[in-house]
């Protein structure tokens, strides 16, 4: 098994980490096996990355036969779109390293918890936007093939988890057009 950390540089000078839990293939048992992968996006209100939604989740997926990756994305004081671009890069990295990490590049899912659910849903809904294409990303390479949302922050409207949007947007927290853009419903 491989356990490693890849650094992702944020556009604001921050550093995210992609932590991999990868099952190696055995020459005795299907040495060319490709496994599905899952990118785990912990919650924490864009203030922290919850430990309980990180490695414990990765180990459960690993035990189920997935190559598991945890994104420790940048939180406060980083603001939108830093974490979105970090998740975009993480999805791209998983597919770029599919051979090395024994990943079936057509079966890469994402799971997000709370604010991490917002981040995962956000990438899924904007993966083909011009901003990401202009940054050099192929929409097909960054959009998850499946999405699991666990108690996600979805709306920025009346029922919003205000703390998550305050942390994500900082001074832009009252910008109606930005709030609308980031409201996933």
Where are these regions (language model features)?
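Alpha/beta-hydrolase superfamily serine-hydrolase fold, recognizing
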Residues: 1-185
């Amino acid at each position: 098994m491989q356990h490693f950390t890849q650094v992702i540089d944020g556009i604001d000078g921050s550093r995210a980490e992609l932590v991999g839990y990868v099952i190696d293939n055995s020459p005795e048992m299907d040495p060319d096996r490709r496994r599905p992968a899952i990118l785990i996006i912990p919650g924490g209100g864009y203030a922290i990355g919850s430990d309980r939604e990180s490695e414990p989740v990765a180990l459960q997926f690993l035990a189920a036969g997935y190559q598991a990756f945890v994104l420790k994305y940048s939180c406060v004081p980083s603001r939108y779109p830093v974490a979105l671009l970090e998740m975009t890069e993480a999805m791209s990295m998983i597919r770029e390293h599919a051979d090395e990490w024994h990943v079936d590049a057509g079966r890469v899912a994402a799971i997000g918890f709370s604010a991490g659910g917002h981040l995962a849903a956000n990438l899924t809904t904007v993966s083909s936007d011009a901003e990401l294409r202009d940054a050099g990303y192929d929409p097909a390479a960054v959009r998850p093939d499946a999405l699991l949302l666990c108690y996600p922050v979805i709306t920025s409207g009346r029922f919003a988890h205000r703390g998550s949007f305050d942390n994500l947007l900082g001074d832009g927290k009252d910008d109606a057009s930005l709030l609308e853009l980031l409201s996933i419903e």
